[in-house]
């Protein structure tokens, strides 16, 4: 049976390959906080001005991808923390849903492929690796 933690059994890069040049987790968390704040300020500014807010699809996907990858990395680094596992599973699903809705997948297999049964975590690795950090 495929193992979403190690990536064994999936046609996707294993964590060591997908995240080989990823920033350290603390730096990535700080960068994600900044990106999240910027997106929230844009939404609030549009709301205050009474204008419709259309989030930048590219920035939104980048945020989701980086968040899902960080959660995956945290879950791998700290397998004893169930909350990290739950976050990794949930955020991988959110990225896959976004990519389905917006047709923004970059990798060999799209988010709806049977390849990702039973988990989208390897999908996150495929997409992160394709990103080319």
Per-range role (PLM):
Residues 1-63, 74-133:
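Long, non-catalytic architectural segments outside compact domain cores
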């Amino acid at each position: 049976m495929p193992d979403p933690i190690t990536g064994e059994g999936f046609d996707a890069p294993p964590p060591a390959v997908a995240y080989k040049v990823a920033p350290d987790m603390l730096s990535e968390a700080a960068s994600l906080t900044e990106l999240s704040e910027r997106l929230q300020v844009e939404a609030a500014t549009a709301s205050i001005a009474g204008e419709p807010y259309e989030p930048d699809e590219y920035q939104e996907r980048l945020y989701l991808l980086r968040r899902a990858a960080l959660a995956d990395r945290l879950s791998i680094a700290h397998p004893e923390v169930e909350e990290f596992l739950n976050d990794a599973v949930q955020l991988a699903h959110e990225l896959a849903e976004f990519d389905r809705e917006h047709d923004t997948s970059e990798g060999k297999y799209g988010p709806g492929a049977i390849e990702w049964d039973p988990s989208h975590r390897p999908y996150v690795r495929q997409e992160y690796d394709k990103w080319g950090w």
